[in-house]
Amino acid sequence: MRKLLLLVMLTGFGIATFAQKSYQFRIDTKEMKALDRTLTSVEPLSAVPLTKSDKQAKRITPPADRDVNIVSIISIGTSANAYGYYGNQRSYVWVESPINAVSNFHRMGGALDPGGYSGDYGYDISTDGGQNFTNEIEVYKATNNAGGTYYLDAARYPNHAIYNPDGNTDPANAYIVFFGPNLDGSNGGSWGGYSYGVASIGDTSYHTKNLLSSHDDFYHLIPSAYDLTSQGLSMVVDINYDIANSTYLDQLNLIRGYWDDNVKDFVYTEELMDAEMPGSGSTADEKVAFSPDGQTGYICVLGDNDMAEQPGGFKGYYPIYWKSTDAGQTWDGPYFIQLDGPNGIGGIVYHHLTDEQIENLFEPPIPAREDINYTTAFDFDIAVDNNGNMHIAVVIGPTGGNEYSIITTKNYIAAVDIFTNDGGTTWFAEEMGRIENFRGNFGDISCDNRIQITASQDYSKFFISWLDTDIEDAEENNQPNIFIRGFDPTTYMKTQGDASGTDGPTNVTLFSEGMWQAYFFAAPKVCFESDKGTYNIPFVYEDMDPNDPIQPVQFKYIQDFTFTDADFVIQAIKKHETDARTNATVSQNFPNPFNGTTYFTLSLEKGNNVSLVISTLTGQQVSTKDYGYLTSGLHNLSISSNNLPAGVYFYTVNIGNQKVTRKMIVE
């Protein structure tokens, strides 16, 4: 057993000077550690009234000459507050293609459930591929308040799926399956119980309710690992954690459920599996996934079990996994994935940081690439392809000076797919996109990039999505867009970022009502594929007040974001520029006219010093801003109308010796 001090966020600025460390960071290094994994059990009953955030973006209509495809977004269910989507669960949204259904599972309350309780569960469902929804169907109701303010069976962060009997094509014969923690207090504090059951889609009056408290050697926490296989296994993984003594018990709790037709419900059993973490003291996150035939499965955690080499004397997280080839009955492992060092993944060791980034990050003497320590971030997602190979969607970056922290300086972290093509003997890393901002803070809750992975129907292609605030001045991930990139591991082709062929991820919510406010998004494990080679990836996010998460939220469903096979292209090999030319493009600002804040994009072929000058029509300078050195790639920059009277202005972007001028109008 290991005594575990629950991790809290740490943002540090300083030189890392620790014993037995082989290199030092420059003084402006920014790093973070994992959030408290116990999450919030009892939310505030009321909150101080707050004004809706001034940063809350309204729907932006792009100019007619702009080649963009704004997604269609509709309102579906509601919830009493924003906490329900707050955890690391990755099964809030489920697609069941044989019945053309997609469901969103959440806690109740909000505008569609007046007076509803956040300890109850419900769902929203479409059986026509996401075009029309029936919302706020309640399936679980807390009833045991034991004389207190909060009900002991109040349900929290849910996992869910659609159980569709083999060969069925009628949604009425399918069931919603759910499994989550509750507040029965059997594991110390508020936590300790599980709430689970099923609900008939065809007969909404039929739903089951089952409760299981911590017992014997089983200490229940908040399971974030869930999958429902094609063979009908409902698989949950939790850590065995004694809250009263703040002790991780070096075990995972494997919870298997099978459909019992006699009781029209899933019946579960529990089993403990050894999972010692002597380095990190516990895991940061856990996931489980199976191949499309349900035969090959992986349980994967982020942790440090002292098996991996940690170069440079720094401590970080890495993937540790167990594998099953008999439909989840037995598990082999643990195995670990070496990210860094001489035996690490080449795509990380030799390609994650550029020479320029290494020079800017470390004090002399500059370490060799093989001596730089890398870590995963603190949440992730996994999928298993049609050949039984695991894909790990995770954010990686250099390990910080503090143990189990990650450098979060802009563009030093990236969303990647770590995958194998031979069952786990060899591992590769393919970058999906650079990340500008890591963590968002919303009142008393926070979330990181929430990276997720969605498979095509045949599990041959994968779509990795995450949240990022792509505004140059932003220091936190508080105004997130949804980014996504598709990857074909057989051909190594990836999707283009936009119609111009940008080598990077696609901004799903660009110019939509979700732009810069796609809070706590969720993606399904599998996408729709109505036409062969057309991949419709549904997303759900919370429309919420970012300053006050206790306020009711509206769930928003993105209906029509798609990739096609034609979007997958061979990525060009980047050339090393040796001349002095500066190739940069500056967009027209949007919105325009504006009052408040407007934005423009700057595309740099290579890094350079950038500044901004705003002047009147007569040439009088009224404002200047120096952005310093910006790296190559896309940058979203902002202009404020504060202290600018209504009128017409020019903004000039200076990129090295190049100048680009555009006209803007302040209302």
Locate each region found by the language model.
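C-terminal outer-membrane/trafficking sorting elements
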Residues: 1-7, 11, 15-18, 577-667
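Extracellular, repeat-based ectodomains that mediate carbohydrate processing or recognition
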Residues: 20-571
